[in-house]
Structure formats: structure tokens, C-alpha cells
């Protein structure tokens, strides 16, 4: 089965809310970066490395951690290029998990008050 992610809560968020991020169907024993990102252009994802968290999937391919989400953040591309300020009240922000190769479940959309 394809890997899945859940974020609780995922809507009605305030700046600095701590959400629970869980993954299932992940590669057992693989480390995943957990972070908040936004599609800022077609195929371009800018993320917030300042609040990244890391988690390793257990033998069943499950993982869970907490993450602080921001209404706006300093966005960086995967190659480390600074994108600029991302405002989640206008951008499509999400929380996701990805391994070192960029593989992981689809990101979960989040929304702020």
C-alpha cells in the first residue's frame, strides 16, 4: 500500500500550534524529515527547515512525532536556496514526511485561522 500521513489537528491552526504528525506504510528503519512546506510555484516546494523534526519508522513502517507549525515562515527549496517569506493564509501549506531521497507520503494540507 502507498504510504500515508495524518496531521492532527490540521485546520483552524494558530501560529506556533504543535501538531501530531503520523505516518504509516513507510520504509521500516528509514529516517524521515518532518516539516511544513508550501507549493510556491508549479512543482516548486518551499519548506521551513527552522522547525523540521526527524523521526525513524518502526518495524511496522509507522512513525509519529510532533511539529510546530507557522502561519508564515522563511521558505527554502530542497537544494537550500532561500525562497523568501511563505504566508500560509494565501499559500497552499502542508505538512509532510520525506526520506533523504525525497520519498514519502503525500503531504497533508493544513489551514490557519
From Swiss-Prot:
Lineage: Bacteria, Bacillati, Actinomycetota, Actinomycetes, Kitasatosporales
Family: Belongs to the neocarzinostatin family.
Keyword DNA-binding: yes
Keywords, in A-Z order: Antibiotic, Antimicrobial, Disulfide bond, DNA-binding
Signal peptide coordinates: none
Protein name as annotated: Neocarzinostatin
NCBIfam families, A to Z: chromo_anti
SS bond list: 37-47, 88-93
Molecular-function GO terms, alphabetical: DNA binding
The organism of origin for this protein: Streptomyces malayensis
Amino acid at each position: 500500500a502507498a504510504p500515508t500521513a495524518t496531521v492532527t489537528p490540521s485546520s483552524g491552526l494558530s501560529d506556533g500550534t504543535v501538531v501530531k504528525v503520523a505516518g504509516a506504510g513507510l520504509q521500516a528503519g528509514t529516517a524521515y524529515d518532518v516539516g511544513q512546506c508550501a507549493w510556491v510555484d508549479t512543482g516548486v516546494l518551499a519548506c521551513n527547515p527552522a522547525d523540521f523534526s526527524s523521526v525513524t519508522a518502526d518495524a511496522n513502517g509507522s512513525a509519529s512525532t510532533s511539529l510546530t507549525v507557522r502561519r508564515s515562515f522563511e521558505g527554502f527549496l530542497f537544494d537550500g536556496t532561500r525562497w523568501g517569506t511563505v504566508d500560509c493564509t494565501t499559500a497552499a501549506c502542508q505538512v509532510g514526511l520525506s526520506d533523504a531521497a525525497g520519498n514519502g507520503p503525500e503531504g497533508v494540507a493544513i489551514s490557519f485561522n
